[in-house]
């Protein structure tokens, strides 16, 4: 792949085309987490968010937690969990807190709190093409601000918008020009 070869050699470049914004793994990770925040009773969304790159909890721990807690209910996190299951509990507590406050603050603020709580900036920048990955993640916050500026009223509405957009292939990635490019 040309992009990977350019990135591996540190060659400044600007990709036009390629994967669309909504098909990117990092965008899917944020969308999954926002879906879990809006619908914490949706076990599949919660599983996807907690297992995905934001919380990065392993399958073994998730399956063990699921058996011990009878699911992934963010409002019924057991107190007597073994240490190896604490990352699951912390992730569920984060989702619960963000769910409880999501309608009392701007959508972009909830996204910012999610990114801060999971230290996503640090993780995403280490990915291949990390600057582009991080630009895409930050672009989601920009989309949230635009959504509200254009009259969007609810967190759920923004999540629905992201989910609908994921079914299309029209939006390009957030443009960034590599340092030193002209």
Question: Over which residues does each language-model region extend?
Answer:
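Conserved motor-region signature of P-loop NTPase helicases/translocases
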Residues: 1-55, 59-63, 74-79, 83, ...
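Amphipathic, charged-and-aliphatic alpha-helical interface segments
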Residues: 67-70
């Amino acid at each position: 792949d040309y992009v990977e070869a350019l990135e591996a050699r540190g060659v400044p470049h600007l990709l036009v085309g390629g994967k669309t914004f909504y098909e990117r793994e990092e965008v899917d990770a944020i969308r999954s987490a926002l879906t879990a925040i809006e619908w914490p009773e949706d076990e599949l969304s919660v599983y996807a968010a907690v297992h995905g790159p934001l919380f990065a909890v392993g399958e073994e721990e998730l399956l063990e937690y699921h058996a011990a807690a009878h699911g992934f209910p963010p409002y019924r996190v057991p107190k007597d969990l073994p240490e190896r299951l604490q990352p699951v509990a912390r992730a569920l507590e984060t989702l619960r807190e963000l769910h409880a406050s999501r309608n009392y603050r701007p959508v972009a603020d909830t996204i910012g709190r999610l990114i801060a709580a999971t230290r996503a900036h640090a993780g995403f920048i280490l990915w291949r093409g990390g600057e582009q990955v991080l630009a895409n993640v930050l672009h989601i916050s920009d989309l949230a601000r635009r959504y509200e500026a254009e009259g969007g009223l609810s967190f759920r509405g923004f999540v629905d918008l992201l989910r609908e957009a994921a079914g299309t292939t029209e939006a390009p990635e957030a443009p960034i020009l590599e340092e030193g490019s002209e």
